[in-house]
Every structure is written in C-alpha cells, then in structure tokens.
C-alpha cells in the first residue's frame, strides 16, 4: 500500500501542475488589473465597408489584420440606427430607451439651445400634418449618467477621448463625464471640414470644433486623430489607460486626400463605387494601423483589449449620388432595416481572445461596458446595465448564444421613417410601427435582405414577439409617441 501511495504522489503532483497550466491561460480573463482598453468607435461605417466583412473595393489591410488576430462578430448591432443614442449607450451600458436619448442631439448652431432651467426638453413635437405627436429628444446626456470612463477612473485608469462626442454642449463635454483628456469632442455631429484648420465655409462661429486647435494647415482630420491617439497611448504607457477614439470619419461631408481619391478613381468599381468615400475609409484604416503599430512598438499589444465598431449602419445617399452600398443588407442609416443597425465589430486581446475566429452570436453596443468590467474586475453584475458580459461568447466564438435584442425610435425621420420599435428574437425580427401601419416580420437566417414580409403568414409568432416588445418598452419606461 505504501508503494502505491508513493507512486501516486508524483502522478497527483503532475495532475495538479497540469491543471494549473491548463487554467492559467484563463486566469488573465478572470481578472486583468493592468489591462489597457481602446475602443475605436467609427461614425457611419457600414457592415460591409471593410474587407474583412465583404468589401472588394475599399482597402482595409489593418482592420482586416485586426480581424485575423481577434474575433469578428457578424451579428453585431448598434444600439440605434443613428449616432447620439448609440454613443450614449456605449458609454453607459444602457439602452437608448432607458437613457431617453432616442434621436441625434442637435448642436447649438442647429437650434439645440438648453432652457434656462437646464432641463432636457419634455413634452411632444406636433409634426405638422403627421398623425402622431412624438416625444421631444434630449439635448444632452445628463451628468448623472455613470459612464465607462468614470467607472474605469475609479479603478485607477487614465482616460482619453478623441474625436466625435455629440452628446451635448460644453458643460456636458467628455471632461465632465469621466475623461481626463478630450481632443475634438464637442456638440457637433460632423466636422465643418476634414482639413486643418477645420473651419466652416460659412464662417458660423458655432460650427467649429473648439478643442481641436489648428496644428498644420491642410492636415487631414483622421490623421490628426490618429496622431493624438498614439500620443495619448505613449504618454500613458506606464499606467493603465482607457482610450475612446470616436472618429469623425466616415460621416459627411465627404472629403478625402486627393492622392487617395485618384487611386480609387482608377480602380474597377463594383457595388461600392464612391472614390471619395473609399479614400476616407482607407485613411481610417491607415490610422487604425498607426495605433496597432504604436501598441507593438511600446510592447503593449498583449496587454490591450482593442474593440473596433461603428455607431450605426452606412449612409447610402440616393441612387444619383451613392455614398456606400450596404448590400446584401436592406436600406441604410436611420432606417429600421439591417442596413441601418447591423455594424462591423472586432475584438482583439492576444492570448485571451481567440485569433481569426468568427462569432454569429447577436451582440449590441451596450455589451461593451459590462464586458470590459468583467475583464477588469473578474466579475460583473449585469443587472445594473442593459448590456451583457460577452466574455463567454468571446471565449467560445464557435457557439451561437441566443438572446433577444430591442430597438426604439419614437420619432419621424423625413417622410420615409415613422416611429418604430424592433425586436430580434432568434432568427426572427419584428418591426412595429406606432402609426398603425402594418408591421414587418423577417426570417434573417433565410432572408438577410429583408425582402419577404412574413407577418400575414405568421400572426401567432408576430403577436408573441409583439408582446415581448411591449413588455420591454414598459420595463425601460420608453418615451412613446401618441395619437393626436
């Protein structure tokens, strides 16, 4: 018996050692106290606007490399089909229906003047001859909202914002929402110009980026943002940092460097054919590469979670002046179809996130905050947010995790878009129109382009999804349009 025990001791030691080695690769995911976090939040980038997601016209070697080094999410969604709601959702982990920011926020030069009492607008817009009164949209994200930057500052992070903010005037800028550094973040939803000194052609002093001083006349804005990002990374290399680069590109005005426009003018065009837009995408890619190179040269790559995503679907423009093409998805930015809300998303953290994998699990903007906290703290209480911790999804990209996703837009947008709410449950997507128009039901697995409305053929399924949607609207206390 003694011999057996003596023989078993080395075996047990080996098993314990092997078990420790097996689990050690996951310990970094359990808690990573010195993890750096970079979120690249692109403006208006469509689902197929990069090579890794299907473009054969736009050249994006650095973003494609990022996808090869991490997990690519093909069922990734923006929280809204327009910018401000998605941006607030990313920062707070809360759905636009819950934050109350359900439309894009008007800047000062667009009439976004906050009342003397400092409150966000209440009540309804009458909308002329339209049948619904719609809730007034907020003019700022309240300072009472706790942002991912504030949460990470509490954990000892240096925090930086570069680029577009679009969540209210000066008193609501990034530096008042947890960011130590703010370069370019103001109330504007688009730049007055993409070339230094970034001044409007009409001379409107309210249509400027107040915290982006001129550096070199003629310098391209996306290049400037990339340089500022690298500078922030280098200055904080000895500490842990959170950087949000919310690029102004590829939002209008369409402006690009001449040499890149000439390059794309000379290339064979397909479904995507706008040379200026293509040049803007390439400049974006160049500066993603600039950040990746900086992380490599500073020895920070393996200790940095890098998230790449977009705030809504691509802007297609009109048939006579196409901006981009979102096919096989239907429609574009601002609309309730996949072309308005499905976006490219990539996550990379070498040694912790599988490389070169694709996940089909549905994810949404609000998931970023709880996922980051899960990696930083080792655990997260999801009940505090509308987003979900994606760490299991990321670790097992081959598995498809099911969940319900929701959207809410209680406003009119031009003459085409009426107030709507959406639920995606499994492969099915229901669009409910609040003006009484017939809803739409699509099987996304077999009809990604949303060509065949199945609602009349599946009334029971449609009603089941509608009841889920109505329950969610009540739970979030969503602002609703009302009949006149």
Predicted regions located by residue number:
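A long, amphipathic alpha-helix that forms part
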Residues: 226-236, 262-304, 463, 471
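Short, structured active-site-proximal loop/turn typified by the sulfatase FGly-forming signature C/S-X-P-X-R
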Residues: 56-88, 93-98, 158-160, 180-186
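Active-site-proximal N-terminal segment of extracellular/periplasmic enzymes that hydrolyze or transfer
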Residues: 25-71, 452-460
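A short beta-strand-to-alpha-helix junction
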Residues: 33, 56-60, 77-82, 108, ...
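Formylglycine-dependent
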Residues: 106-158, 165-241, 247-256, 268-269, ...
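C-terminal cap/loop subdomain of S1 sulfatases and analogous C-terminal strand-loop tails that border
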Residues: 181, 186, 314-338, 352-357, ...
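A short aromatic-rich beta-strand->coil structural motif
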Residues: 37, 43, 152, 164, ...
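Histidine-centered active-site microenvironments of extracellular/periplasmic hydrolases
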Residues: 174-178, 253-257, 293-352, 364
């Amino acid at each position: 018996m003694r011999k057996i025990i003596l023989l078993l001791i080395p075996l047990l030691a080996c098993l314990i050692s092997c078990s420790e080695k097996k689990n050690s690769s996951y310990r970094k995911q359990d808690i990573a106290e010195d993890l750096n976090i970079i979120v690249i939040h692109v403006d208006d980038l469509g689902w197929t606007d990069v090579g890794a997601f299907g473009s054969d016209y736009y050249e994006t070697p650095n973003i494609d490399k990022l996808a090869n080094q991490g997990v690519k999410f093909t069922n990734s969604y923006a929280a809204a089909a327009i910018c401000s709601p998605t941006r607030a959702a990313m920062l707070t982990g809360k759905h636009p229906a819950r934050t109350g920011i359900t439309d894009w926020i008007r800047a000062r030069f667009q009439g976004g003047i906050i009342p003397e009492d400092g409150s966000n607008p209440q009540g309804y817009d009458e909308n002329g001859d339209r049948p619904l009164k719609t809730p007034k949209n907020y003019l700022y994200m309240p300072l009472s909202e706790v942002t991912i930057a504030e949460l990470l500052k509490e954990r000892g992070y240096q925090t930086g914002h570069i680029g577009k903010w679009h969540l209210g005037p000066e008193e609501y800028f990034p530096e008042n929402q947890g960011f130590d550094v703010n370069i370019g973040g103001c109330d504007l939803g688009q730049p007055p110009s993409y070339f230094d000194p970034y001044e409007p052609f009409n001379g409107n002093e309210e249509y400027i980026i107040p915290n982006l001083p001129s550096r070199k006349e003629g310098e391209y804005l996306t290049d400037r943002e990339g340089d500022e990002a690298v500078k922030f990374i280098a200055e904080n290399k000895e500490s842990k940092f959170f950087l949000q680069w919310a690029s102004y590109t590829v939002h209008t005005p369409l402006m690009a460097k001449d040499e890149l426009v000439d390059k794309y003018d000379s290339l064979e065009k397909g479904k995507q054919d706008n040379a200026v837009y293509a040049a803007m995408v390439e400049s974006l890619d160049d500066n993603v590469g600039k950040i990746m190179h900086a992380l490599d040269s500073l020895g920070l790559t393996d200790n940095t979670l890098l998230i790449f995503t977009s705030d809504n679907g691509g802007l297609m423009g009109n048939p006579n002046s196409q901006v981009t093409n979102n096919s096989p998805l239907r429609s574009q930015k601002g609309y309730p179809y996949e072309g308005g809300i499905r976006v490219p998303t990539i996550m990379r953290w070498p040694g912790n996130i599988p490389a070169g994998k694709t996940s089909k699990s549905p994810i949404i903007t609000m998931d970023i905050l709880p996922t980051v906290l899960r990696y930083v703290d080792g655990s997260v209480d999801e009940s505090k947010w509308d987003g979900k911790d994606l760490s299991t999804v990321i670790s097992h990209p081959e598995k498809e995790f099911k969940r319900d996703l929701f959207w809410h837009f209680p406003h009119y947008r031009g003459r085409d878009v009426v107030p709507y709410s959406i639920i995606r449950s499994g492969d099915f997507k229901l669009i409910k129109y609040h003006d009484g128009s017939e809803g739409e039901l699509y099987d996304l697995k077999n009809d990604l382009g949303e060509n065949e409305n199945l609602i009349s053929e599946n009334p029971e399924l449609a009603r089941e999804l509608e009841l889920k949607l109505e329950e969610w609207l009540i739970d979030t206390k969503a602002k609703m349009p009302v009949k006149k």
